[in-house]
Structure formats: C-alpha cells, structure tokens
Design a protein with these regions (language model features):
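Conserved, well-folded catalytic cores of nucleic-acid-processing
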Residues: 4-8, 45-52, 87, 91, ...
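Transmembrane alpha-helix detector for multi-pass membrane proteins
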Residues: 137-156, 171-246, 251-252, 257-263, ...
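Hydrophobic alpha-helical transmembrane segments of membrane transport and translocation systems
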Residues: 227-229, 233-338
Length: 338
C-alpha cells in the first residue's frame, strides 16, 4: 500500500482483538479524506464484542455486521492492493486482519460489489458496457427462473402462439410440474458447483463442465426435464458467475429460489412483490451509517449515479463520493498556467 500511496497523511492504526488469539488488526485510512465519525464508528464496532479469538476476517465480518440477519454482505473484500488504494482515495477505511490474505473495505455499497478492479484498466466505453452487462446478468440470475414459471403457469397469453406450442411440445412426457422440474435441475447444478469447489485443481473445473453436460443431457433424455429448463438454468448460472464479488453473488443465489417460488405460485404479482420487498430491505441497510444503495438514493449528485451504472471518463470524475470529507471533495482539476 505504501508503494501505491506515498502520502504522509495515510495512517495505519494497529489494534488487538481476541482475548486468547490477540489477533492484530490494521486500520488504513487517509487522514484528511475519511470522516472522523465513520472512523470512530468502525473502531467502536470492532471493540464492541469480547471474544476468545478471531482467526480470520470472515469471523470479524459476521460478528460486526449491523444487519446480521441479511444475506447481503456489508463488508467488501479484496486481495488487490490497487483496489484497496483506490478505495482509500475515495475516503473509505481498509481493515487488514492478521493471517488473512484479503482486506476488508468499509463502508460498502451495492454499487461497489458490482464494480470490478479491471474496470479502471479499460477505456470508459468498454468498462461502461461491462457494468451494464453485469446488471443485466444480475437480473437474469435472480429473476429468470421465476419469470419463466410465472409466464408458463399463469400468463401464457403474453407468449406468441408458436412459442407457446414449442414449450408445450418440449414438456410433453415430463411427469413433474414445471416448479418441481426447475427446482430439481437448479439443485443438481448447485451440487455440481459445490463438488467442483471441493475437488482440487483442474479436475474441479472438469467436473463442473462435464457433470453439467451429462446430467442435463441425461435428464432430458429420460424425460425428467424439458430442454428449455436446461437452457434457463444454464443462463441463470452464467448470470451469477458474471457478478464480480462471490459473497454478493451468493446472496442472490439464495434470493433466486425465493423468486422461483413466488413466480411459480403467485405469477407476475409474486415477482413484483419480491422485487418490492428486496428493494425495501436493501433501502433499509446501512454500512456504518452509509446507505447501502448509495449513490442511487439520498441526495447523490447525478454524476455519482451515472458513475455507478457507467464508468465515467477519468477527467469527468472530479468530485469524491458523498462519504468522503467534503472539505476535500475535489480530486481532479486543471493546473493553472503560469
């Protein structure tokens, strides 16, 4: 970090946590950019509990989350020093836990989980295209199975006749309902994914690819599922893999099943209800006093909102985000010619 930010105002504070482990934590921040209230709130939260030991930062993360019941992560993690340095310049705090290969970034936001470190290495047109693609992939990963069930069970009138007949022909001979069919295949792919993670090396990747192909083809040949369901599950899985942060993607993997049952038993009304409840939950989340949906809520400037969905050119990113100290809000200006 010192190689990337040679600034005397970048401070490193050490603290110990864990009665028996005495795990060393390091808090990194830039003194004139971070809000002192935010910094103090983070310190207070870290010192709130007395525990035998903190062995890895995942324990620290789950112990100090404000909304511990929420599936959405409230700490952002990174293994890349360049990403951590970028967030320090935005006025955030980076927490490094002893014996852990990645750092925690505070506060976190919905938009931050959808950003990739590679965005800053691409030209802004390509980076903006990739961000839009990620948001579309997110909607696909969460809503596609539920929308399919809602349409095929309750709203067939919105489909063209030829497409509806094609769906009916594909499902001919399948003994299960469309809900059971989709849940069976989704859980099968979850098993394959988990097996691929547990098996080491390239063999795990081979299990994921070959296992998916074999199970999908065998299920279609045995008339257990229809081909369209295999395609929907595959698109859903691909959409989830596009999300840069794995913890964030895992939250939506769980949410996918909620929308699946809402769409399967309540139709489009269930999908709309699920979207409303999810948006309400996300709107109520705070990360150390910062709204989780920043910059899409509150009094964010329109440029902040634009830089959330798109990646603005560097020369247009002149103002720091709202959570940085506003006395140092300007981060880019032209030099005056002498």
């Amino acid at each position: 970090m010192r190689k990337r930010l040679r600034d005397t105002r970048m401070k490193v504070e050490e603290m110990s946590i864990g009665v028996r482990s005495n795990t060393v934590l390091q808090l990194l921040y830039i003194e004139d950019l971070v809000h002192q209230e935010l910094l103090q709130a983070i310190k207070d939260r870290l010192e709130e509990f007395e525990i035998d030991g903190i062995l890895y930062s995942g324990m620290l993360e789950q112990l100090t989350e404000e909304a511990w019941y929420s599936p959405f992560p409230q700490y952002q993690t990174t293994e890349r020093p360049d990403r951590a340095a970028q967030e320090l310049l935005n006025g955030k705090v980076v927490v490094i836990c002893d014996n852990t290969p990645y750092a925690l970034i505070l506060p976190s936001s919905f938009n931050g989980f959808m950003e990739s470190s590679e965005d800053w290495y691409h030209h802004f047109e390509m980076a903006s295209f990739l961000r839009i693609l990620r948001y579309l992939a997110l909607m696909t990963a969460v809503l596609l199975p539920g929308l399919y069930l809602a349409v095929i069970r309750f709203h067939t009138q919105i489909l063209p006749t030829n497409l509806l007949l094609s769906f009916a022909e594909a499902r001919e001979g399948v003994p299960f309902s469309s809900v059971v069919e989709l849940v069976f295949l989704e859980l099968s792919f979850e098993l394959i994914r988990e097996a691929g993670v547990r098996v080491p090396g390239s063999l795990g990747n081979a299990i994921g690819i070959v296992g998916g192909l074999i199970i999908g083809q065998a299920a279609v040949s045995a008339n257990l599922v229809s081909p369209i369901v295999v395609m929907i599950v595959a698109l859903t899985a691909l959409g989830g893999m596009v999300i840069p942060n794995e913890e964030f993607a895992s939250a939506f993997r769980l949410l996918k099943y909620v929308f699946l049952f809402l769409g399967g038993y309540l139709g489009i009304f269930g999908i709309v209800l699920g979207i409303y409840l999810t948006a309400a939950h996300l709107s109520g989340l705070l990360s150390f006093g910062i709204p989780y949906l920043l910059p899409f809520v509150k009094k964010s400037p329109i440029k902040d909102v634009g830089d959330g969905i798109l990646r603005l050119p560097f020369r247009k990113r002149r103002i720091r985000p709202l959570y940085a100290r506003q006395e140092q809000s300007l981060r880019l200006k032209r030099r005056e010619k002498s």
